[in-house]
């Protein structure tokens, strides 16, 4: 790997230098060839294993943990920071630059009495969801590898430590800006320094002046809205949408007790630590706006409040348009050449009525969409009909759907197109859990198979139909904790 160290050299007050503590008996548990290509790597090697497990130095790496703050479950925490993630620097790849971080690399000045470690189960889950989201075309950070060990760590019980090697276009979060506005009061100079760095590194087409700052914030609003639109379309619940877990670039970031929907449930909660459902699936669009409002508050020393409010008022449209584009594709509806408020309203109503029917009839979200690939949209009798208990309500919806759909000249091509946008496979929590149990027993094959399937989620994989099934009774509605 070839590194540059722009964050390290230009923002010395934004981090603490800290070196990883190696894990014992490191081994490759998983590796992403796809992610490796981003930073110019090919195959995992013994030398790389020692470096990324923290046992030897990686040439060109500087090692540091960033400081930031954030709103967690609605309350402001003035000092957070990378408690168990150590960044090596910015790796220069053939087509871009990626931060390389060791998540679980050991304690840092921001560990808050924690051990700085990640357990194997959380490392495997982060790796798998990074692969899954990327191949579902959802903006996300990536994971290069999972490195296991025999190092014992204690959570609710004794587990083993592991490291996720994360790749991110940037590790700058909403919380970085909050820290230098609220926690370090009177440091508007640092806020401006961070803002200028972010624009120069990631938005080079913008200027570092008043006009550029406003254009940048609008881009952040649009990118955040687009990310959440993707989440809602694929049925992904993040689970911990604190502002310190929000990437400034609109990439899905910091995965903990996430889940993909099994049975469609608007108020689905995937986080055991969120009993009131602040971060429930259906709340995510609203939380996205709330988090952007917190970012806007932090930017008031730099951008006038009236301008910030005007930009925030564009969030809803920035969310709805990509959501409509994604959902129209899932349904096979023709794109709208000329934007129409009335057509958008009608399509949102059609989509909403369909998901309400899914919830009322307790249907699997992913499987129901996939069934469209078997549908003859010109037939009066839908193959979907038998899945619904209330067939009269379905018939009413289906008639409206056919009317909006219009004529379909090539039915096989239409069906193929539906299968290209409606995945057959998602990372169901029970599948991740089965892979984790197998790893604990020394069997990596289920993990590697699941990774392979998740990199081709739209393919049939006829030999692995079992991985597309609804969860068994024990796997229904698995809720994870933040313990990792």
From Swiss-Prot:
Q: What cofactors does this protein use? A: Mg(2+); Mn(2+)
Q: List the disulfide bonds.
A: none
Q: Which reaction does it catalyse?
A: L-seryl-[protein] + ATP = 3-O-(5'-adenylyl)-L-seryl-[protein] + diphosphate; L-threonyl-[protein] + ATP = 3-O-(5'-adenylyl)-L-threonyl-[protein] + diphosphate; L-tyrosyl-[protein] + ATP = O-(5'-adenylyl)-L-tyrosyl-[protein] + diphosphate; L-histidyl-[protein] + UTP = N(tele)-(5'-uridylyl)-L-histidyl-[protein] + diphosphate
Q: Cite the binding residues for Mg(2+).
A: 245, 254
Active site positions: 244 (proton acceptor)
- Enzyme class, spelled out: transferase
Q: Which domain of life is it from?
A: Bacteria
Q: What is this protein called?
A: Protein nucleotidyltransferase YdiU
Which source organism does the UniProt entry give? Shewanella baltica (strain OS195)
Lineage here is: Bacteria, Pseudomonadati, Pseudomonadota, Gammaproteobacteria, Alteromonadales
